[in-house]
Structures are given as C-alpha cells and as structure tokens.
C-alpha cells in the first residue's frame, strides 16, 4: 500500500491542478490530508485521481481519499485535546491508519501543547498498540538530533520563537520514539535531511510517518516528494510511505 500524507495549506483552494499533478506523480493508494478545510476540493481531487472513497471534516482539518474501500472512518477528538485525529481502517487489510495534525507555531508553549496532544492521541489508540498501525501527518515539530536553521525560517516563525525566549525543547517526536515507534523516513534515509517546509526551499522536517517497531519489517520505502509541481502546490512537501499490508 502506498500511503501519502500531505498538508495542502488552507484547503488547497486555487492550487488544485498543482496538487493533482503532485499526487498523481506519486501514485498513492491512500492519501491523508492536513488543512483539508474545503470538502469540495477533496472531492475534486478524488475525482481527478479516480478514487471512489474520500471525506473531510473542515473543523478538524483532516481529510482523506482512497482507492481502497474503508471498513471504518472516524474523526476522533480526545476530550482533553484541541486537535482531532483521523482513523482509517482499509477493508480487508491488517493495517489501521491514524491521520495527525498537531498544533502549529515554533514556540516553547506550543511544543508543550503538541506533547499534550500527542499523549492524548497515544492514550486514545492504546488498544491498537500491539497491532499494525501507522501515524501519518504534520507533527509541526523537529525530531531529536536534527538541526534547524532559524535564520532561514519565515519571519512570523522567527518572531514566535523570539517571544518564547528563543529556546524550544523539541520533545514531541522523542515521545513517539520512546513509545515504541520507528520514524519511517529516517529509517530508510539516515543521512537525508528529509526537509518538507517551506516547499519552495525546505528548511525543516515537520511531516512524518511512524509505525510500531514490532512491525518495522512492513516498511518498504518512505520518500519526500520533491517534484516541480510539489513546490508550487502547497507550503509543505508530501511524504510517501510504501507498506507491506499482506
């Protein structure tokens, strides 16, 4: 199964042709969207890809489209979290997909919020912890040990960091790893920075796919899509993971 996670920025309005070209070039079976605030756009993208199954919940920002029929689709919002997550169960397959979009802005207070949201998500899916599942989406945070060139970031991002004291302890991804997951991209590309934002000249990696280390053998490949259309379609580059779902 080819799984694409893609933040399409502000619903993708006005950029559908570039989005469609980007998605088509990666030939996914399932796409998980972030900032999917315009259901009509998701429907048109699904139609353009001849994908019969799609959905979006504007207030939760998460959507999907798929060639594969889904046995179960649900948007969850943990009671203690501001952000929802999307649950997809492809029919006849042993995998469950959880679409994620954590709070934005690089600041100490928002990193603490992301940690809170992530822990709420992990508690909510604890009954799946031993099964084959995937966390995919825009985590809006930096992985441990990775460098961030603050000077190259947009002014609004630098301003948020300055307000928070200029220092952010990047703990969210560490929590994922300590919870028994592997970072799909980093597993396949130890030396590739894998930067995904901004798409026109990436400076930071915010988009991830994780799966339990007990199912690491099911990961076949994971790549950032760096096509010309991807640089124009959104402010994020999409991430494609290929999984063995036999």
Predicted regions and their residues:
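Active-site-proximal beta-strand elements of phosphoester/diester hydrolases
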Residues: 1-9, 94-104, 136, 236
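N-terminal, active-site-proximal structural segment of metallo-dependent hydrolase catalytic domains
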Residues: 1-47, 246
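Catalytic metal-binding/acid-base residues of hydrolase active sites
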Residues: 9, 37, 101-103, 139-142, ...
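Short, Asp-centered acidic motifs that coordinate Mg2+ and/or phosphate
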Residues: 29-30, 132-134, 208
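Structured beta-strand-rich core segments of catalytic domains in phosphoester-bond hydrolases
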Residues: 30, 34-112, 116
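Active site of divalent-metal-dependent phosphoester/diester hydrolases
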Residues: 39, 48, 52-67, 79-82, ...
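Active-site beta-strand termini and strand-to-loop segments that position acidic
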Residues: 65-68, 86-93, 211-213, 232-234, ...
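His/acidic metal-ligating clusters that form di-metal
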Residues: 115-139
């Amino acid at each position: 199964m080819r799984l694409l996670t893609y933040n399409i920025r502000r619903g993708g309005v006005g950029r559908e042709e570039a989005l469609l070209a980007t998605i088509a070039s990666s030939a996914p079976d399932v796409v998980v969207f972030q900032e999917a605030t315009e259901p009509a756009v998701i429907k048109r993208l699904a139609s353009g890809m001849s994908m019969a199954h799609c959905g979006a919940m504007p207030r939760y920002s998460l959507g999907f489209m798929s060639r594969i029929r889904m046995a179960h689709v649900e948007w969850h919002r943990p009671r203690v979290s501001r952000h929802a997550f999307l649950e997809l169960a492809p029919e006849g397959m042993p995998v469950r997909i959880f679409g994620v979009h954590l709070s934005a802005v690089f600041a100490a207070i928002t990193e603490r919020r992301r940690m809170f949201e992530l822990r709420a998500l992990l508690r909510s899916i604890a009954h799946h912890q031993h099964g084959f599942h995937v966390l995919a989406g825009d985590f809006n945070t930096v992985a441990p040990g990775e460098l961030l060139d603050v000077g190259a970031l947009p002014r609004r991002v630098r301003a948020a960091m300055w307000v928070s004291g200029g220092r952010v302890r990047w703990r969210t991804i560490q929590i994922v790893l300590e919870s028994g997951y592997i970072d799909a991209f980093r597993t396949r590309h130890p030396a590739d920075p894998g930067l995904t934002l901004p798409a026109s000249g990436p400076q930071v990696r915010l988009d991830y796919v994780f799966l339990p280390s007990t199912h690491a053998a099911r990961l076949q490949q994971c790549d950032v899509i760096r096509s010309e259309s991807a640089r124009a379609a959104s402010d994020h580059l999409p991430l494609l993971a290929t999984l063995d779902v036999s």
